[in-house]
């Protein structure tokens, strides 16, 4: 069976999607096809494909779920909101192809609130393989983007303390005017160039989670900076390293990467490698089909069922309504539980 990965194809404002696809490709026996996540129905004529459907969901829910010739492997997925779960068709699709591996706890809670067996997988970019930079390792690299740019004053301060002249590179993608497959080719090349640049640096300072995680995976010293270190979206990185408060940079004496749980990082990398290998071997979701993942399958079903029943009871009793609203859209939850 042929294999595919997916990337953002509509607005093209997230090189992180490309890096997540590369993280899967690192462990595949052959180069995968690349599909447009926002236009998967276009792949209906390509024959049967095993699709690693990790990444961010999504700009346009009207073209979801994917056509039946695609066998989706849902792990390391992130939902920006609960809109994707407002259609019964989508919920049944996820149940059919579950258990679903979520990239973050918020997505996990949304899936469980919809009664979908699910588990926490973290982000696949934590398992990217090291690249060769082709040159001596030197200097400090500052990686940000237009949506979250480090102030010049902060960059200068970091460089002064480290005695390094910082180099800046953008994490933003390019090629918005190109047809999809040309964009895919150029964006993969651009992402690989970024990975090689990270590996050629003594230290990386970044505001981007999909720069920090690849650096951790490849053994590059990295500092993740954010104005709100406790933000839930940062959790896939925060479980491995300390997130530095952007507003307190001037109070730090060191900018070394702080890996809080290196053993956990190595275990996650092995899990990702085993997961992808098992998916290829069984031609589907290994958590559903491989005996090796049977305990995780049972736990995902049990935990999700318990969560679903608890939330349904709370919703009917009017308990913690505001808190529930932060996890899922109350209207869609009410529709599914009546």
Regions picked out by a protein language model, each given a short descriptive name:
Residues 1-338:
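Active-site anion-handling motifs in enzyme catalytic cores
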């Amino acid at each position: 069976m042929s294999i595919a990965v997916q990337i953002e194809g509509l607005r093209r404002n997230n090189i992180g999607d490309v890096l997540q696809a590369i993280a899967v490709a690192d462990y595949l026996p052959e180069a995968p096809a690349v599909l447009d996540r926002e236009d998967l129905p276009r792949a209906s004529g390509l024959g049967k494909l095993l699709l690693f459907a990790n990444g961010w969901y999504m700009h346009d829910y009207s073209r979801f779920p994917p056509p039946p010739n695609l066998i989706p492997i849902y792990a390391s997925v992130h939902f920006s909101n609960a809109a994707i779960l407002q259609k019964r068709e989508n919920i049944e699709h996820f149940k059919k192809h579950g258990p679903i591996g979520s990239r973050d706890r918020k997505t996990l809670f949304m899936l469980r609130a919809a009664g979908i067996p699910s588990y926490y997988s973290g982000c696949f970019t934590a398992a990217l393989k090291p690249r060769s930079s082709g040159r001596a390792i030197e200097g400090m690299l500052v990686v940000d983007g237009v949506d979250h740019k480090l102030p010049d004053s902060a960059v200068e301060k970091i460089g002064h303390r480290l005695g390094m002249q910082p180099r800046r590179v953008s994490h933003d993608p390019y090629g918005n005017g190109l047809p999809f497959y040309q964009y895919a080719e150029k964006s993969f090349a651009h992402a690989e160039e970024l990975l090689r640049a990270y590996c050629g640096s003594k230290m990386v300072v970044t505001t981007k989670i999909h720069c920090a995680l690849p650096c951790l995976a490849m053994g590059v010293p990295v500092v993740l900076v954010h104005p709100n270190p406790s933000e839930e979206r940062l959790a896939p990185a925060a479980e491995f390293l300390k997130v530095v408060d952007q507003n307190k940079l001037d109070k730090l004496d060191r900018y070394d990467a702080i890996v809080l749980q290196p053993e956990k990082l190595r275990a996650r990398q092995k899990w990702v490698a085993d997961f992808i290998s098992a998916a290829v071997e069984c031609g589907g979701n290994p958590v559903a089909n491989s005996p090796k993942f049977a305990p995780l399958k049972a736990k995902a079903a049990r935990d999700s069922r318990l969560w679903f029943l608890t939330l349904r009871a709370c919703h009917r009793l009017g308990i913690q309504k505001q808190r529930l609203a932060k996890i899922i859209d109350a209207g869609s939850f009410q529709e599914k539980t009546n």
